[in-house]
């Protein structure tokens, strides 16, 4: 039994080391439903690229020796989800720049489908299941409207394995009266999920880069045990 026990100990040590090398698996979900016009999509895509290359974001990514794994996908209808950046371990500045360049080179796959947020969340959590071993898992759901196709976020959380996943939100076009009344409360009540989940607000797509920069810094900054904030 001693050789078997030694093997189990070794495997546990190797597994623990793999997780320790990655502190966070982060997936960004971009809304390309029909309510997002071509100019807005360009601002969204460009905002992600600019945010990933911002100095304060890079500083947060490389704040410790433990890395962040990053993936990006776009979503709209029930079956319209496309990976823009597959899992990439951001283990240095060159990896972060390459990830940003990959997103910059993408083109929108769909423009005429509704907002199937529950289906998008289901796709995102399956993508997280394929991530490298990481200590934490976060999905960032960006959008400019409420779910209007298929099942909603809460049904997704009940149907898919979200127990160990934090879902943050990035609300776009929420600076107007309609957004204040409907979209922001919807995200806070229905979309945010898990310990420490939070909401970032972009006042239109022109404000997307600023909001994404702020959100990324908060998401990838290493967590201090005992000081994980609650959602807002």
Per-range role (PLM):
Residues 13-17:
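N-terminal signal peptide c-region/cleavage motif recognized by signal peptidases
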Residues 22-86, 90, 95-142, 168-182, ...:
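Von Willebrand factor
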Residues 29-39, 70, 86, 103-114, ...:
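Second-shell loop/turn segments in exported
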Residues 41-49, 53, 67-69, 100, ...:
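Extracytoplasmic/secreted envelope proteins and their assembly/folding machinery
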Residues 49-57, 77, 125-133, 147, ...:
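Sec-exported extracytoplasmic/periplasmic mature domains
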Residues 146-189:
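VWA/integrin I-like adhesion module and closely mimicked acidic/polar interface patches used
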Residues 172-226:
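Von Willebrand factor A/integrin I-like adhesion domains
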């Amino acid at each position: 039994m001693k050789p078997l026990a030694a093997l189990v100990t070794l495997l546990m040590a190797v597994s623990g080391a793999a997780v320790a090398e990655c502190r966070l698996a982060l997936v960004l979900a971009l809304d390309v439903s029909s309510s997002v016009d071509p100019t807005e999509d360009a601002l969204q895509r460009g905002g992600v690229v600019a945010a990933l290359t911002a100095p304060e974001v890079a500083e947060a990514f490389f704040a410790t020796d433990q890395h962040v794994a990053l993936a990006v996908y776009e979503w709209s209808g029930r079956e319209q989800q496309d990976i823009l950046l597959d899992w990439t371990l951001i283990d240095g500045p060159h990896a972060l720049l390459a990830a940003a360049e990959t997103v910059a080179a993408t083109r929108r796959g769909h423009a005429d489908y509704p907002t199937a947020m529950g289906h998008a969340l289901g796709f995102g959590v399956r993508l997280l299941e394929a991530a490298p071993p990481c200590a934490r898992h976060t999905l960032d759901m960006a959008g400019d409207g409420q779910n209007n196709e298929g099942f909603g976020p809460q049904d997704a959380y009940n149907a898919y394995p979200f127990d160990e996943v934090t879902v943050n939100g990035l609300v776009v076009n929420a600076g107007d009266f309609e957004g204040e009344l409907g979209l922001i409360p919807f995200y806070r009540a229905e979309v945010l999920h898990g310990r420490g989940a939070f909401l970032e607000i972009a006042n239109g797509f022109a404000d997307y880069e600023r909001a994404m920069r702020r959100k990324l810094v908060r998401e990838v900054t290493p967590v201090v045990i005992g000081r994980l904030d609650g959602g807002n």
